[in-house]
Amino acid sequence: MKPEPKVATVEFTGGKSLSFETGKLAKQAHGSAIVRSGQSVVLATACANADPREGIDFFPLTVDYREYTYAGGRFPGGFIKREGRPSEKEILTSRQIDRPIRPLFPEGFRCETQVIAMVLSADSENDPDVCGINGASAALAVSDIPFNGPIGAVRVGLIEGQNIVNPTYDEMRASKLNIMVVGTAEGIVMIESGAHEATEEEVVSAIEFGHGEIKKICAVISKLAKEVGKTKRTVAPVELDQPYLDGLRKKIGADLADALNTEKYPKSESYAKVKEIKSKLKEEIPADDDAALKKLGKYYELLREDIFRQQVTKEKRRPDGRAFDQIRQIWIEVDVLPRTHGSAVFTRGETQALVTTTLGTGDDMQRMEGFEGEAKKRFMLHYNFPPFSVGEVAFLRGAGRREIGHGALAERALSAVLPSEDKWPYAMRVVSDILESNGSSSMASICGGSLSLMDAGVPLKAPVAGIAMGLVKEGDDYAILTDIAGAEDHYGDMDFKVAGTTQGITALQMDIKIGGITAQIMREALEQARRGRLFILDKMNEVIQSPRTELSEFAPRFYTLQIPTDKIRDLIGPGGKVIRGIVEATGVKIDVEDSGKVNVASSDQEAAKKALKMIGDITATAEVGKTYLGTVTRLADFGAFVEILPGTDGLLHISEVAEHRIKDVKDELHEGDQVLVKVLAVDGNRIKLSRKAVLKEQRAKMATEGGGDGGPAPEVEHSEHGAPGGVTFEGGYEGGDEPEVEEGEPNFNRDDAPGSHGATQPHSGGDRPDRGPRPHGGGGGAGRGGRGRRPGGGGGGGRGGHGGRGGGGGGRGRG
């Protein structure tokens, strides 16, 4: 019998909705829920092992979010038509689900737990990541897994001053703010945001608006769990052996507090002292007493945390002696590596990032595939955290989820100030290698990334700095900490990262380890972060105030031209043969867009000019009124076909071959001859040419100048392929524009013509052997004897006639 699912719907401000359904699919999972937003559908499941995992002191939670291409009605690309490893988007969304739910499991719960969210259907309007977070919350709520939820998640946009809940893709592109807010009915537990220099008040207003919508989600999930949810498992409360902790404090409390004083000891020395104290305590315990050793480890860590929290909340003192709003010492250097396109070292306290920028072309952009199709990404920021940065030994493997998450945050912070692609067509890759770490390494990556991009000459709208804020809260008493170090991050209640310019916020990330925080605490934290951000920006401006005006000599230069869209095929050639030939001949990179925009990139200026000229020759179009040096490709009874541009033929009708009437085209022309022709008309792909018009113009010109030896005729620029040299394109390039061809001034001086024969010259007399000389020149025939290269024309040496003294006689001189 078909099961009847339980369905509940949330109605949001603005008319959008989110529906939850349970009891129909994946019923053997301990908890499952279907979440719908528009036509986007996500299935979320939750399962936990019955028995706790032995020998661990952490909660073994795994979260996986997957976007299958079938959700968008697509096949996976490539040879293997099956989804493979998770994409970056899937990993980041998995983290967005993990981070808010992890603190809400009861302390002491050690059963392996797995949450899986699968995108089953995806429309082109609604991002399913919101459904994934809400689905995970609903699946846990209706399961028997102990969970102190539910949570709700909404994305908030800001368009023309109005907050919008769960904006569509189109709305997000127009939004000043893109903020994911996750919380319980009581408070906010996670924030993930990108923004275009939003103010602190705009951010807080969006968060408060989002929390109002979250309360609606939590109410619906709670009602659903109450109606169809399973009975929760019982978890034995963690008992605190207070006498044991007090005894440990009395015995080593003072020594441990001294060892944790990083104002007195550097981080490495402090950690060594802390480890030494613990080792001495272990020596007092029998080696085979595992229970006692385990208990010592647990309470030793509790004592460390308690000492830290008491120092901050009661003594108003940080471990390194700084004031709550004080930033560690900063030193900065740019242009540190000779061959990179841009580089910077940003050091803040014991955290150091070496950040490099590499500029590339369209071919270097990241190609991404998802259910919505394929896309390109021109800006990438990759964050690396080698083990030596914290003095440890470990295998070097691929980037983990933490590294991907930190890189994405820094990337989002800098994306807001990048120039638009039409003004800056480069692909950009920023790599942050953390060389030292004691907290806030992702924020050091943002600062170093901004410096590195400016060192590379990327015209950023403004420099960006990032700062990490912390919170220690005991009851109503709390302290907000600026520029938190590693211990403050580990033992504190909040990790609040804020990045931005002098004008506003570009990225935000907040994780809360407690039940939630109030809007007032958030306002104070944002204001304190703003002051810290401005301080860091001042330090950065002391080193480099604006992007460099000159690119590195090793960076590629972009040259752009616009070609007709119907010429794209000619440029690419069959199987890419033509464009590959240009690349192989010049070493440049070429990117052709569907609009006809061609980007040529090379660090060698001469190679780029050569490639541009080759492209211009291949894609040039015939212009009415212009004269071209063409090659006869085929003869017919009614005329000749002349290639005036590569791949472009025009018809030279028999009536336009000469000024006099001819009976047979072969009397004047042969295949392979080069002739000067003028374009009379262009009708689609049909081009009408005239040689007669060129001859008339030349004769008139010579007559005006007094006939005879009127001096050498001016040369006409031409390309290697016979097309006019130089190209005209959007923006221009140093090769210059196409020279205008003056009427009556064709080029008679072509030395590199195929077959080593001269250009066909205009006639003053006839081509017949019996024709005598006329004014301005003899009537040499279509002779094959001499080259006829005298200034002003020169005789061709005919079959029976003779060339005039200064005339333009001579037909096909083929000497």
Curated annotation (Swiss-Prot):
State its location(s): Cytoplasm
Swiss-Prot/TrEMBL cofactor(s): Mg(2+)
Q: Which superkingdom, per the lineage?
A: Bacteria
Positions annotated to bind Mg(2+): 489, 495
Q: Which residue ranges does the record annotate as region Disordered?
A: 700-815
- Show the InterPro entries listed in the entry: ExoRNase_PH_dom1, ExoRNase_PH_dom2, ExoRNase_PH_dom2_sf, KH_dom, KH_dom_type_1, KH_dom_type_1_sf, NA-bd_OB-fold, PNPase
Pfam family for this entry, one: RNase_PH_C
Q: Which reaction does it catalyse?
A: RNA(n+1) + phosphate = RNA(n) + a ribonucleoside 5'-diphosphate
Q: Where is the composition biased (Acidic residues)?
A: 735-745
State its Enzyme Commission number(s). 2.7.7.8
Record's GO cellular component, any one?
A: cytosol
Q: What is the first-listed, main subcellular location in coarse terms?
A: cytoplasm
Q: Where is the KH domain?
A: 556-615
**Gene3D superfamilies from the entry?**
GHMP Kinase, N-terminal domain, K Homology domain, type 1, Nucleic acid-binding proteins
| Residue span, S1 motif domain | 625-692
Give a GO molecular function annotation for the protein: RNA binding
Composition bias, kind Gly residues: at what positions?
Answer: 723-734, 775-815
Q: Which HAMAP family match?
A: PNPase
Query: What is the protein's known function?
Result: Involved in mRNA degradation. Catalyzes the phosphorolysis of single-stranded polyribonucleotides processively in the 3'- to 5'-direction.
UniProt record similarity statement: Belongs to the polyribonucleotide nucleotidyltransferase family.
What name does this protein carry?
Polyribonucleotide nucleotidyltransferase
